[in-house]
Amino acid sequence: MQKRVRNRLITIIICFCSAALGISIILYNLEKNIVFFLPPSKINEIEEGKELRVGGLVKIDSINKIAADKISFVITDNIKDLDILYQGVLPALFREGQGIIAIGQLLDRKFIARQLLAKHDENYRPPS
């Protein structure tokens, strides 16, 4: 093999290995952010006290107002339910049967949310 062809082949192999290593490092570091939220049925796999996002539908007749700015409710993915406790201002789209994402921690098998995000479908129309 000529020296020029051999050097080109070595350069291509080094570039390919560098790109593969870079992509591996990026995917490893983004592992927890690839999935935006977990459904309630996957929560038992998570250790308590770890910050995470859970999502599902607010179960009908589960909203319980504790104080002026504190509520508890249940979200479901039709497989498992999860109790959520939230203190703060509710999103405008928050209601029973609505999809939500809660950001917070799991403590004593109850999810303590510090932020709620209300989801809507592609046919969103603001409340009139």
From Swiss-Prot:
Cytoplasmic topological domain residue ranges: 1-8
InterPro entries, A to Z: CcmE (IPR004329), CcmE-like_sf (IPR036127), NA-bd_OB-fold (IPR012340)
SUPFAM superfamilies registered for this protein in UniProt: Heme chaperone CcmE (SSF82093)
Periplasmic side, ranges: 30-128
Key words, A-Z: Cell inner membrane, Cell membrane, Cytochrome c-type biogenesis, Heme, Iron, Membrane, Metal-binding, Signal-anchor, Transmembrane, Transmembrane helix
Cystine bridges: none
Domain of life, per lineage: Bacteria
Transmembrane annotation, as ranges: 9-29
Compartments (UniProt record): Cell inner membrane
Family: Belongs to the CcmE/CycJ family.
Protein's job: Heme chaperone required for the biogenesis of c-type cytochromes. Transiently binds heme delivered by CcmC and transfers the heme to apo-cytochromes in a process facilitated by CcmF and CcmH.
Name the record gives this protein: Cytochrome c-type biogenesis protein CcmE
